[in-house]
A protein has these predicted regions:
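Loop-to-transmembrane helix entry/capping segments in MFS-fold secondary transporters
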Residues: 43-44, 133-143, 430, 513-525
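C-terminal transmembrane helical hairpin of 12-TM major facilitator-type secondary transporters
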Residues: 443, 455, 461-503
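Intracellular loop-helix junctions on the cytosolic face of multi-pass helical membrane proteins
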Residues: 1-8, 100-105, 118-119, 133-326, ...
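Hydrophobic core of transmembrane alpha-helices in multi-pass small-molecule transporters
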Residues: 92-96, 100-119, 486-500
Length: 586
């Protein structure tokens, strides 16, 4: 019994919930840092507060995948989790902008991320459950379309609220503007309604039907079992975990000590403590398996060790693909403003700031010394560049804001004008980066339906490699751009890569997974999205500050290079379920 093909509108309905999910992500990405700063967070604290997203994804998605694989009730298999996640996420979107304290906003971010992950993970598995192999590329491309549309509109919601509906975008100190609040209310409603549309307009196959479809597929195409059968006993597999886990704990402890002893950037603790934490969980799984406890933790890590070959190959591709994305998201604003816009100061202006800084008395504010210490490090770096023969340097907004806000500093009018010019250039550049991000999301939505056509003419691997290469060219080309308008052209390549990353790897993966493990493996696959994010948050600041001498543009070039590497690695992936591949074999 072959899995039936679904009409276009049925695929539309089953993917429509992603519109709401991405509205939640778009509002979060565009406004949460603003909420944190409004409630008193120092800029240096924000990356740590943002670690909620990858950590919750790392924990929640495999658990939800495992639970949904083993759920069947009158609502179905995946849809109960759509409903629970939608309710929780919608409530979190309403509460977050009304948080009176920073700790409450940070807590709501964790709840929001967990809720979004509860909803999102089963949506990936849902496509694998419902669509035959020849339609999966279209199904995941449909999700890319809704992601692009929602990201484009959601990012502009506060602007729309202010400029179209006249809702104020200013508020008393420590309060969130009404434009942001109403954007979150609207986003919460869209999230809930879009997911409910999918719940009420779709039905799911029963576990028995899915098993029959899988058996028919294996018989028709001669496919062996999609995951390796355990070739060792529980005791042997537990022993392996009991070796690997403590090794990771020890490595994490050693690296943490090195970070502490050498005074490295504190962001590196995210990586070192994370290594130890993963080791602790693996050790726990081994301990429970040794005692014949076959709960979710044991099953998740057993399945991690028994990943299908295709999934292992795709994991490496995803790792380098998402490292590039996080490099772009973190550093595009700094790269564009410092490399393309005029944020330069000459040697005389640097000397004046150094002298003014040396005359400042220590302030009593709790964060003043820390802020001034970072400004002094920047000024020392500027002096080093000038002594090396440079006639001017690129100023950081940290330095500019410090001296413009510091009322007791006596500066010449010319230097103050330079600082104001740099501030204006930075804001114009940052606004333009926001526009360019909107362009790549919008283009991703438009091009999403082109990907299945390209895959039909070539194959899924070639199409994905082309898209990643286009994205790499787009990122690297920013180094050579002098006209900001050309950034929009570069972002077309990025949009193609983004649309492909959100669809083709999942289409390839779904064909390599057994139906009864679709959810848990989609959750485990998220590891290879989250881990590069944690790695990027941990080491990119160190790399940019030391190896790249503070020039953020090279972070984009590094991202482009990792996309090229990912494009090459795609061709090593065994796409066992590619429709063209199976047609040739037949």
């Amino acid at each position: 019994m072959k899995k039936p093909r679904l009409p276009f509108w049925q695929i539309w309905n089953m993917s429509f919930g992603f519109l709401g999910i991405q509205f939640g992500f778009a509002l979060q990405n565009a406004n949460v840092s603003r909420i944190f700063e409004t409630l008193g967070a120092d800029v240096s604290q924000i990356p740590i507060l943002w670690i909620a997203a990858p950590v919750t994804g790392l924990i929640v998605q495999p658990i939800v995948g495992y639970l949904s694989d083993n759920t069947w009730n009158r609502m179905g298999r995946r849809r109960p989790y759509f409903l629970v996640g939608a309710i929780l996420a919608s409530l979190a979107l309403i509460v977050m902008p009304n948080s009176p304290y920073l700790w409450m906003a940070a807590g709501m971010l964790w709840i929001l991320d967990a809720s979004i992950n509860i909803t999102m993970e089963p949506f990936r598995a849902f496509v694998g459950d419902m669509l035959p192999s020849e339609q999966r590329t279209k199904g995941f491309a449909m999700q890319s379309f809704f992601i692009g549309i929602a990201a484009f509109v959601g990012s502009f919601l506060p602007y729309i609220m202010t400029n179209w509906f006249g809702i104020s975008n200013v508020a008393p100190e420590g309060m969130i503007p009404d434009s942001v609040k109403f954007s979150f209310y609207f986003g919460g409603a869209i999230f809930f309604l879009a997911v409910m549309w999918t719940i009420y307009r779709t039905r799911e196959y029963s576990p028995e039907q899915l098993k029959a479809f899988e058996e028919a597929e294996k018989e028709e195409h001669g496919i062996d079992e999609k995951i390796e059968a355990p070739d060792r006993s529980d005791e042997e597999r537990a022993r392996t975990k009991m070796i690997h886990g403590p090794v990771l704990i020890i490595l994490g402890a050693i690296f943490s000590y090195l970070v502490f002893n050498q005074g490295f950037a504190q962001e590196l603790y995210i990586l070192t403590v994370g290594i130890a934490g993963i080791g602790a969980i693996i050790t726990l799984a081994g301990f429970m398996q040794r005692r014949s406890m076959h709960n979710g933790v044991v099953v998740i890590f057993d399945d991690l060790y028994l990943m299908p070959k295709t999934m292992k190959q795709l994991a490496v591709v995803q790792f380098f693909s998402w490292f590039a994305l996080f490099a772009m998201w973190i550093y595009t604003t700094s790269a564009v403003t410092s490399h393309i816009y005029d944020m330069r100061m000459d040697a005389a202006e640097v000397s004046e700031l150094v002298e003014a800084g040396s005359l400042l008395e220590t302030r009593t504010e709790a964060d003043w010394f820390d802020r001034f210490g970072r400004v002094q490090r920047d000024l020392d770096n500027y002096q080093t560049q000038i002594e090396a023969g440079q006639s001017n340097v690129t100023a950081s907004m940290r330095v500019v804001n410090f001296f413009l806000e510091e009322g007791r500093v006596e500066l010449t009018e010319e230097t103050r004008q330079t600082l104001r010019r740099i501030e204006k250039e930075y804001n114009e550049g940052a606004d333009w980066v926001g526009v360019s991000f909107g362009i790549y999301n919008g283009f991703a939505a438009l091009v999403a339906f082109l990907l299945p056509v390209m895959a039909g003419f070539t194959n899924r691997k070639t199409t994905h490699a082309i898209a990643l290469t286009a994205g790499a060219i787009g990122l690297i080309s920013i180094y050579f751009i002098t006209n900001p308008m050309m950034i929009l052209v570069a972002m077309i390549g990025v949009g193609l890569a983004w649309a492909s990353i959100l669809s083709l790897p999942y289409a390839i993966l779904a064909g390599s997974l057994p139906s009864h493990k679709m959810g848990i493996y989609m959750g485990i696959f998220n590891f290879f999205i989250v881990l590069p994010q944690i790695l990027a948050a941990s080491i990119l600041g160190f790399i940019v500050g030391t190896i790249f001498d503070g020039q953020a543009i090279f972070a984009l070039i590094l991202g482009g290079c990792t996309w090229i590497l990912a494009a090459g690695l795609v061709f090593l992936v065994d796409d066992v379920d590619d429709p063209g591949h199976k047609a040739k074999e037949a």
